[in-house]
């Protein structure tokens, strides 16, 4: 049986918006997990993912209210905003999936350079490592970091660089963020189509002579 009736479209749209709320919560949790374990060091990336999660939840609330009350104006703005969110989320997700190791290293280097010494020391203790990368263009930084490093590994004199440890987890985090974002960006197109279809349907409980 094809879901084409008013009630079926309404229930489908409500269910989809509940899924959006869960996805928004998932994005916030994954971003917080990445920050807590030092996987993603840039506060701009963390803030961006959390902002997308909160924004997606707000859009889902608007969609739920519009679906429950068959509110024409709210459904229209819901469609427009959801399509814009789709474009943004699709672009970000593709960027996460397409980021290679060299780009990840550059991102970590730029984030490391703007960190204060206290932030670096705190991260080194949490990951039990010293310095970022032992490369020729970062020799000055690595020597300074090794001098200031107070991680437990310094007592064993077997410290690895923090960059290597973060790269091990950053690929995993980027794949999770990119995969989840890409999958649900396509469900947002489904949401736009459902909202458009539902908006143009007549409410059977309304006055039969009333215009949509």
From Swiss-Prot:
It is found in: Membrane. This is Tetraspanin-31. Glycans are attached at residues 117, 134. Residues 1-12, 66-72, 197-212 are cytoplasmic. The lineage of its organism: Eukaryota, Metazoa, Chordata, Craniata, Vertebrata. One of its GO terms (cellular component) is membrane. Pfam families: Tetraspanin. InterPro entries: Tetraspanin/Peripherin, Tetraspanin_animals. Belongs to the tetraspanin (TM4SF) family. The chain crosses the membrane at residues 13-33, 45-65, 73-93, 176-196. Keywords: Glycoprotein, Membrane, Transmembrane, Transmembrane helix. The keyword Ribonucleoprotein does not apply. Residues 34-44, 94-175 are extracellular. It is a multi-pass membrane protein. Its main location: membrane. Disulfide bonds: none annotated.
């Amino acid at each position: 049986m094809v879901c084409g009736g008013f009630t079926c479209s309404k229930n489908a749209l409500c269910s989809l918006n509940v899924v959006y709320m869960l996805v928004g919560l998932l994005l916030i949790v994954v971003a917080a997990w990445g920050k807590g374990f030092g996987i993603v060091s840039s506060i701009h990336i963390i803030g961006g993912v959390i902002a997308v999660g909160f924004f997606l939840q707000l859009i889902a609330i608007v969609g739920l209210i519009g679906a429950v009350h068959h509110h024409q104006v709210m459904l229209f703005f819901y469609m427009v905003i959801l399509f814009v969110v789709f474009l943004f989320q699709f672009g970000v997700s593709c960027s996460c999936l397409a980021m290679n190791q060299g780009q990840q290293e550059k991102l970590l280097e730029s984030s490391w350079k703007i960190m204060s010494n206290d932030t670096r020391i705190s991260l080194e203790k949490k990951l039990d490592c010293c310095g970022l990368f032992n490369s020729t263009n970062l020799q000055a930084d690595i020597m300074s970091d090794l001098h200031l490093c107070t991680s437990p590994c310094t007592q064993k004199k077997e410290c690895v660089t923090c960059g290597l440890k973060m790269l091990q987890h950053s690929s995993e985090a980027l794949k999770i963020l990119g995969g989840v974002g890409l999958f649900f960006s396509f469900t947002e197109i489904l949401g736009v189509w459902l909202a458009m279809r539902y908006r143009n349907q007549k409410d059977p409980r309304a006055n039969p002579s009333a215009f949509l």
